[in-house]
Amino acid sequence: MKEITIALVGQPNVGKSSLINALSNAHLKVGNFAGVTVDKMEVGLIHKEHQITIIDLPGTYALNDFTTEEKVTKDFLEKGQYDLILNVVDSTNLERNLALSAQLLDTNKKMLLALNMWDEAQKEGIKINTEKLSKELGVVCVPTSARSKEDRLNTELLLDEIVRLYSQNTTNNENIKVPSQSFKESLKYSQSAQRIAQLVISENQQNASFEHTYKIDKILMHKRYGIFIFLGFMFIIFSLSFLIGGGVQKALETGFKFLSDGIKENVANEDLASLVGDGIIGGVGATVSFLPLIVVLYFGISLLETTGYMSRVAFLLDGILHKFGLHGKSFIPLITGFGCSVPAYMATRTLQNYNERLITLFVIGFMSCSARLPIYVLFVGSFFPSSSAGFVLFCIYILGAVVALVMAKLLKLSVFKGQTESFIMEMPKYRFPSWRMVYFSIYTKSLSYLKKAGTYILVGAILIWFMSQYPKSDAAMKAYKQESLLVNKDTTLSSEAKEEKLKELKTELDKKNLKNSIVGRGGAYLEKVFSPMDFDWRLSVSLVTGFMAKEVVVSTLGVLFSLGDQNEKSDAFRGILRKEVSVPSGIAFIVFVMFYIPCFAATITFGREAGGIKFVAYLFIFTTVVAYAFSLIAFYATQILV
C-alpha cells in the first residue's frame, strides 16, 4: 500500500477542521512539533489502496516569521516530510485567501486547492469560475463543503484528486526555502490575489445575511449591555450543567456505590475488597460520575464558539482587558482556560507583545478548568442548597475571572511594564452551529477526560489507597482483637447490638490505621500548614495530590473519607463532608482550589510557553500566595457571616 503525506495549509477560520473530519470520518490526533509548543493535528485514512496521512498545520495568513503559527507552518513546509500541499480557502472571501495560495505556489511543491464553504458562497450570491481559477493558478481547484453530512460536497472527488496528483512523477522531495516577505513581496502577492479574484468571481451579490449579521451585532456587541448578555449566556451554561448534568451524575454515583458495595460484600479478602471497592471504584468512580456536568459545559461553550460569537466577545472585552494590562487576544486563551489550561497556555502564542503574553500566561490558571468542576460540584452540593447551586457555581467562575483581571493589573504595574499593542483580529461570520463539529468537540474532550480517569487517576487512586492503608498500627490491631473478643463473649448484648458494637470498633481501627499510614503521617505535617483555614489532614493531602491532576482531588477524598457506614456515601460522600468539614473550611477549600497551581501537565506546558523552569518557580510562588491569601480571607469572612 502506497503512503501519501499531505500538508494541510490555510488561513484561520476557513474550515480546515471540518474538512479533515469529513475526509476521514475520524477524530484528529494531536502531536507536538519538536521543541515548539504548537500543536499539529494528524489523521490517517485509506482511499483506493493508499494510506493517506493529513497533517493539519496551524492557521496562518502568510509564511513569515511574525507569529508562532507562521514560524511553525513555514518551518514544516521547509523541512517536513510530505508529498503535496492541500491549500484550503474560504470561498466567501477568496481574494484574501489567494494571497497565501500565491505564496504556497512559489514553493514549487505539488498542490491542490480546496474551495471550502462552497455552499455558503452560493447562498451569498458568490459565483466562482473554478476552471478559470485552475488555469490562473496552475493547480486543480475542487469546491468543497464539510459542515454536515447533508451538505457535504466533493470530499470523495478531493481524495481522488489527491491520489491522482500523487501518482504524477513530478514530486519535488528536496527541502525548500520559503523567504520571509518584504513589504514589496507582500504587495505583489496581494495584487496577484486581487487580479485573480476579479477574473474568476463573476457575480457577488450582497444578500440578507450581511444585514442579519449587522442587526445581531447591534444587540450582542452593544458597548453598554453586550457584556451582560455574554455573562447571561455563561450563567445559563453553568446552571444547565448543574441542572441537567447533576441528575445523571447522581445516577452514576448510585451505580458506582452499588458496584462498590457488591464487591466488598462478596470478596472474602478484606484488603482486596477495600482496594477494589474503596480505592479503584471509589476513587475513579467519584471522578467519572462528574462527566455529565462537564459534557453540558463543553456543549454550551462549543455552541458559542461554532456560531462565531466567542471571537466577537474578544472585541467586546478588548477595552476592559487593556485597562487590566491584557490584550483583546488574551480573551481566547482565558476563555479556553475554562476547558483546559494546556491548550489555553498554547493559545497565548497569538500574542506578539512579550509582556502581555507573560501576564496572560500567569493568570490563565485562575480561570477554572473543567477538571476543577467536580471539586466545586462536590463542595457546593455539600454546603449549599440545590436550588442555589447553579448560581453559586456561576459566582465561582466569575470570581476567578475577576481575580485574574486584578492580578493581571498588579503584574502590569509591578513586573511586566511596557507599551500595549492595538488589537487586530478577523471577525468571523455568524453561522448556525455545526452539530458535527460540536459533537466532535464534546466527544474528544470527554474521551480525554475518561482516559485520565482510566490512566493516572486510576494509578493515583491506587497509590493513595496503599499509602492510606499501610503501615498498619500493631497496637491498634491488638486492642481491636481484645475488645472484639470481649464483645463476642458478652452475653448481655443482643446479636444486633453486638454487630453494631463490632462495627464501631472496626471504624475506630480504620481511623487509627489511617492516621498511622504514610498518608496520615504526611497529612499531619500538611495540616499544620493549612491550620489557619482549619483544613484537616485529608483535605490537605488532597490538595497535594491535586497537582498530579485536579480530578485526583475528588478521588483522593473519595478514598480518605471511605470510613464508617458505607450507606452514608449515597451522595458522593456529601453527607460525610458536611459532618467532617465546617462551612468556613469548605468555602476556603473551594477558594484555594480556584487559585493554586494548575496540574502537572499544564505546569509543564506553562514552563515551555513562558521560557523555562524559573518561570515555573515564579508561577508556584505566585499562585500559592494568591490561593492562600484569598482562602484565608474566605475562611474568616464566612466565619463572620455564618
Curated annotation (Swiss-Prot):
Q: One of this protein's Pfam families, by short name? A: FeoB_C
One GO MF term attached to the UniProt entry: ferrous iron transmembrane transporter activity
Kindly state which keywords UniProt assigns to this record, in alphabetical order: ATP-binding, Cell inner membrane, Cell membrane, GTP-binding, Ion transport, Iron, Iron transport, Membrane, Nucleotide-binding, Transmembrane, Transmembrane helix, Transport
Which of this chain's residues are annotated to bind GTP 2? Answer: 35-39
Extract the CDD domains matched here: FeoB
- Segments forming domain FeoB-type G: 3-168
Any phenotype upon disruption?
Cells are unable to colonize the gastric mucosa of mice.
Tell me where the transmembrane regions lie. Answer: 226-246, 279-299, 361-381, 388-408, 447-467, 541-561, 586-606, 615-635
**Compartment(s) where it occurs, according to its Swiss-Prot or TrEMBL record:** Cell inner membrane
Q: Where does GTP 1 bind?
A: 10-17
Q: GO terms for CC? A: plasma membrane
User: How does the entry describe its membrane topology?
Assistant: Multi-pass membrane protein
Which residues of this UniProt protein bind GTP 3?
A: 56-59
Residues recorded as binding GTP, renumbered to this chain, are: 116-119, 145-147
Q: Which PROSITE patterns match?
A: G_FEOB (PS51711)
Q: Which Gene3D superfamilies match?
A: P-loop containing nucleotide triphosphate hydrolases
Q: Into which family does the record put it?
A: Belongs to the TRAFAC class TrmE-Era-EngA-EngB-Septin-like GTPase superfamily. FeoB GTPase (TC 9.A.8) family.
Q: What does this protein do?
A: Probable transporter of an ATP-driven Fe(2+) uptake system.
Protein name in UniProt: Fe(2+) transporter FeoB
Species annotation:
Helicobacter pylori (strain ATCC 700392 / 26695) (Campylobacter pylori)
Q: Which gene encodes it?
A: feoB
